[in-house]
Amino acid sequence: MQVSIACTEHNLKSRNGEDRLLSKQSSNAPNVVNAARAKFRTVAIIARSLGTFTPQHHISLKESTAKQTGMKYRNLGKSGLRVSCLGLGTWVTFGGQISDEVAERLMTIAYESGVNLFDTAEVYAAGKAEVILGSIIKKKGWRRSSLVITTKLYWGGKAETERGLSRKHIIEGLKGSLQRLQLEYVDVVFANRPDSNTPMEEIVRAMTHVINQGMAMYWGTSRWSAMEIMEAYSVARQFNMIPPVCEQAEYHLFQREKVEVQLPELYHKIGVGAMTWSPLACGIISGKYGNGVPESSRASLKCYQWLKERIVSEEGRKQQNKLKDLSPIAERLGCTLPQLAVAWCLRNEGVSSVLLGSSTPEQLIENLGAIQVLPKMTSHVVNEIDNILRNKPYSKKDYRS
């Protein structure tokens, strides 16, 4: 969109210049006038062609592969930010389920495997996840410019003014996150959920402010509806502010519609990309719950009673049966079921990055292996998976065709 606007301005300037030139030379030689017209027509044609060429060129740069690690990198939406197609999330694990030593080991494995994206939030472990993440980055001495650090704002504290997406909390909340992370800025700050109590203009203005102040490079949304994202974009364009570049959404074999139907439309219309989380559905797809809920699993924790109920429900049993049917496909491809599930998420080109949540180095190494499975995700394999799942969502375009 920026290119097309620039081209339009260029055309207007060219047209004004053409008028001035023609008025000066109209009484002289007609051949000079014709030459000038031809020149400006050529400039206009080139400018218009750039407007159509640039998006195609952008798409051609969408994915690249690191030679040493094999990690793939994609643009975050239609922004210029390059993110590893696999990122490391810190929900539940950092500051909670795992020790600080294990957290450091996980980050080291991820970084050495080519992962540059690390995601956290002010609410994770009441801010402790940010503290651990920042301490590890400082200890390791990794170049800040080689990292993409993202955090999310909404639930900051118990006071009314310490949560939500008011201008006050966005600015104060991000300052608090930066202090815990020991960083000068984050690459992307996310609104962790919509806030019906705050006007959209106030949210967009606050996000624009923290970016202009150098506290963040970009901003995005998490668990927002397509309509809410479009409203934020419209407000940003109306008042010459900065629109969101990405939506964080849940995406896995059993949760598909938003990422496969709604977000692609937003990507093509306004450039908003998808960063997805929970590729293993909170561990449901890992295979560990095939025979009940193990004592050491996430579903066994008191605060995850909802997950346990989901697993033992009738729908949960149906999902486990489908996973058993998918196992032969994984065996044929020479991978594990979790690797198949992560590679299935990555095969969606509309997904900029998939956030992994691992509690052990072994789990992380296994999930990172999905990169090697990705080339095997042919249309035939994807159709096989769809035939087993029987939950493929269809867009309006699909129905029309």
UniProtKB/Swiss-Prot annotation:
Which residues constitute the signal peptide according to the record? none
Q: Which Pfam families match?
A: Aldo_ket_red
Top EC class, one word? oxidoreductase
Pull one GO CC term from this UniProt entry: cytosol
Q: What happens when the gene is disrupted?
A: Mutant mice show subtle defects in learning. Such learning impairments are not detectable in older mice and are not observed when mice are kept in a stimulating environment.
Question: Known EC number(s)?
Answer: 1.1.1.-
Q: How does it sit in the membrane?
A: Peripheral membrane protein
Q: In which tissues is it expressed?
A: Detected in brain, in hippocampus and striatum (at protein level). Predominantly expressed in brain. No expression found in heart, skeletal muscle or kidney. In the late embryonic and early neonatal brain, highly expressed in hippocampus, cerebral cortex, caudate putamen, colliculus and cerebellum.
User: What reaction does this enzyme carry out catalytically?
Assistant: a primary alcohol + NADP(+) = an aldehyde + NADPH + H(+); a secondary alcohol + NADP(+) = a ketone + NADPH + H(+)
Q: Which residues form the active site?
A: 124
Q: Give the residue spans that cross the bilayer.
A: none
Q: Which GO terms describe its biological process?
A: learning or memory; regulation of delayed rectifier potassium channel activity; regulation of potassium ion transmembrane transport
Q: Could you give a GO molecular-function term held by this entry?
A: molecular function inhibitor activity
Amino-acid positions noted as binding NADP(+) in the UniProt annotation, renumbered to this chain: 90-91, 97, 119, 192, 222-223, 248, 277-282, 288, 298, 357, 359, 363, 366-367
Under the heading InterPro entries, the entry gives: K_chnl_volt-dep_bsu_KCNAB, K_chnl_volt-dep_bsu_KCNAB-rel, K_chnl_volt-dep_bsu_KCNAB1, NADP_OxRdtase_dom, NADP_OxRdtase_dom_sf
Compartment(s): Cytoplasm; Membrane; Cell membrane
Q: How does it assemble?
A: Homotetramer. Interaction with tetrameric potassium channel alpha subunits gives rise to a heterooctamer. Identified in potassium channel complexes containing KCNA1, KCNA2, KCNA4, KCNA5, KCNA6, KCNAB1 and KCNAB2. Part of a complex containing KCNA1, KCNA4 and LGI1; interaction with LGI1 inhibits down-regulation of KCNA1 channel activity. Interacts with the dimer formed by GNB1 and GNG2; this enhances KCNA1 binding. Interacts with SQSTM.
What's this protein's family per the entry?
Belongs to the shaker potassium channel beta subunit family.
Its annotated function is as follows: Regulatory subunit of the voltage-gated potassium (Kv) Shaker channels composed of pore-forming and potassium-conducting alpha subunits and of regulatory beta subunits. The beta-1/KCNAB1 cytoplasmic subunit mediates closure of delayed rectifier potassium channels by physically obstructing the pore via its N-terminal domain and increases the speed of channel closure for other family members. Promotes the inactivation of KCNA1, KCNA2, KCNA4, KCNA5 and KCNA6 alpha subunit-containing channels.
According to UniProt, the name of this protein is: Voltage-gated potassium channel subunit beta-1
Write down the species.
Mus musculus
Organism ancestry: Eukaryota, Metazoa, Chordata, Craniata, Vertebrata
Gene that specifies this protein: Kcnab1
